[in-house]
């Protein structure tokens, strides 16, 4: 299928300005890397997502979904087919102690809404830079909390465009993982069950976690957060630091001097710079300590020709 035809058709389905050709994906990731998307669409509701999926299935066009791009490296060759950004699907409702949040809502914003309603349970998320969908996809967590602790169910869309409601058990949550890495479901919304709390206590905890994050993490540079999962009985950052790798740079990307678990884009780095540095760190740590660091960040897209 000719991508010009795909662009022209989807332009009749989505609002004006929500379909683009050859969109640079570095503009849609936190680390500011990534090549072009053949066709880039940003639906505003579930019906538009279904229309894109059905059209893509009809003509066998590959589809890639993006949240807010906080925990992903898109290769320099970009993404073929249709790239679907979910950043406009951002509704959040509160009923009693239940919050229902759509996939594109920032999990930080949801934690603040919980605070506004004196609800406790999402304080840990006050510094996580991902979307709700991304947070469920990887069972995001920090400071002793994680999404699986508060999620009760979620609405997903299958690869055929069918809506389903799944209970938490169906997610098969583990440490920084869920079943969604192995199926073709799209997370559309999540239902969180929280508890009534005291506003001042909730805010104090969030302020404390924010201070810890700002004092320890290199927020002054683009990054994708923690690059590696925590190995059993150890810390990725400590292993990297003890390997003497802080400040190690490949191209425009370096291991942060502030927190060794982060890799920061300090000088117009590329996706390949990130990938090469990740491999170098993994190889060095394994040689020194016999520990294989497992990536937490996702790598998608095509290599640059």
Swiss-Prot record:
The primary location reported for this protein is cytoplasm
Q: Is Cell wall biogenesis/degradation among this UniProt entry's keywords?
A: yes
The record, for InterPro entries, names: FAD-bd_PCMH, FAD-bd_PCMH-like_sf, FAD-bd_PCMH_sub1, FAD-bd_PCMH_sub2, MurB, MurB_C, MurB_C_sf, Oxid_FAD_bind_N
What's the superkingdom here? Bacteria
Example of a GO cellular component annotation carried by this entry = cytosol
Q: What is its EC number?
A: 1.3.1.98
- Its pathway? Cell wall biogenesis; peptidoglycan biosynthesis
Report the enzyme's class at the first EC level.
Answer: oxidoreductase
Q: Which reaction does it catalyse?
A: UDP-N-acetyl-alpha-D-muramate + NADP(+) = UDP-N-acetyl-3-O-(1-carboxyvinyl)-alpha-D-glucosamine + NADPH + H(+)
Q: Which residues form the active site?
A: 176, 226, 296
Task: From the Swiss-Prot or TrEMBL record, give the protein name.
Answer: UDP-N-acetylenolpyruvoylglucosamine reductase 2
> Which species does this protein come from?
Bacillus cereus (strain ZK / E33L)
